[in-house]
Design a protein with these regions (language model features):
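Acyl-thioester-dependent acyl-group transfer interface
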Residues: 1-69, 78-104, 208, 232-277, ...
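Intrinsic-disorder/low-complexity, polar/charged segments enriched in Ser/Thr/Lys/Arg/Asp/Glu/Gln
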Residues: 30-32, 111, 197
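Acyl activation and transfer enzymes in specialized metabolism, enriched
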Residues: 38-57, 115-131, 197-235
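Alpha-helical scaffolds flanking conserved acidic
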Residues: 112, 219, 243
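Short, small-residue-biased leader/transition segments that mark boundaries at the very start
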Residues: 278-282
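Non-catalytic, low-complexity flexible loops and terminal extensions
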Residues: 2-14, 120-128, 132-209, 242
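Hydrophobic residues embedded in beta-strands of well-ordered beta-sheets
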Residues: 69-71, 112
């Protein structure tokens, strides 16, 4: 039986509400995950794998619409098409008044790219989708092999589309702490089409080992490295302002949720640093 999705709609979750109004040519609010394989991608098999994946995650069949007072997501029977990569990474996906899907699957040589407009999902939801997409592709590409399951069969469509913000929101307001104005990085702000990309490949095992040696998580270690990198660029005469970093936190680590919609929040880190001549051990952090 064919599923009827055309009349289904839902409000944007709490974290997604800011994205539609803030998106534009200078900030597309698109992020990318990719998977690098060891052989060239076969486009026809990737297309079939995408269609199989979409059957299990109808939340990705939604388009963004603008109502009288707010934006909302509406489910549409639009085909998702795989394309060979041609545009710069994280190019614009959401175009106002255009009924288009809010993600794009592309490929380049041995790489499968998955780009998504942030109003649709967060990093956790996007990673689950990409994992199943790659799994379906490998099963089609190598039917003689056995692959482990990515998705839990017990989870339902309702679980994936749950607005966990509404479910766990208590209405309790915490007292806000006053924050000092942070140091602003200087430099030329490039248009999206002129974006410069620096790609760095790190050994996950090596990074985890470094983080463990410092007694912190990988997230904390990388955040500290980024703060230190900013610190090194600050003129010593302007060290009075703190270096601030906004780190996204996956709320699924604190509340039970299988939702593939946005369920995250920010943690603000502010570091007031004094200039000292760094020792070789200190500089190892930036490596």
């Amino acid at each position: 039986m064919k599923k009827e999705h055309s009349s289904r709609w839902r409000k944007l979750d709490n974290a997604a509400q800011a994205f539609p109004a803030a998106t534009g040519k200078k900030d597309t609010r698109v992020f990318r995950f990719y998977c690098q394989l060891k052989e060239d991608i076969q486009a026809d098999l990737l297309q079939k794998a995408l269609e199989q994946t979409m059957e299990h995650y109808p939340v990705f069949s939604m388009v963004l619409r603008k109502g009288l007072f707010w934006f909302y997501l509406e489910q549409r029977d639009l085909p998702a098409k795989v394309e060979e990569e041609k545009r710069p990474p994280c190019s614009e996906i959401y175009v106002p008044d255009h009924k288009t899907l809010l993600f794009q699957v592309s490929y380049y040589k041995t790489r499968i790219n998955f780009e998504v407009f942030h109003a649709l999902t967060d990093g956790t939801g996007a990673m689950l989708f990409l994992k199943e997409l790659v799994s379906n592709y490998l099963i089609l590409r190598h039917p003689e092999e056995t692959f482990s399951k990515v998705r839990e069969d017990m989870l339902t469509e309702t679980d994936f589309e749950e607005d966990s913000f509404s479910q766990y929101y208590t209405g309790k307001k915490n007292e806000k702490e006053k924050s000092r104005p942070a140091y602003q990085i200087k430099g030329e702000y490039l248009e999206q089409e002129e974006m410069e990309i620096t790609e760095i490949l790190l050994s996950a095992e090596a990074v985890h080992k470094c983080a463990k040696a410092h007694g912190v998580s990988v997230t904390a270690y990388l955040a500290a490295a980024l703060v230190y990198a900013v610190y090194e660029e600050i003129p010593k005469s302007r060290l009075k302002k703190p270096v601030s970093l906004m780190v996204p936190a996956n709320l699924r680590n604190f509340f039970p949720s299988a939702s593939m919609t946005n369920f995250w929040s920010w943690i603000e880190i502010a570091c007031c640093l004094l200039y000292t001549s760094p020792s070789p051990r200190d500089r190892s952090l930036s490596r």
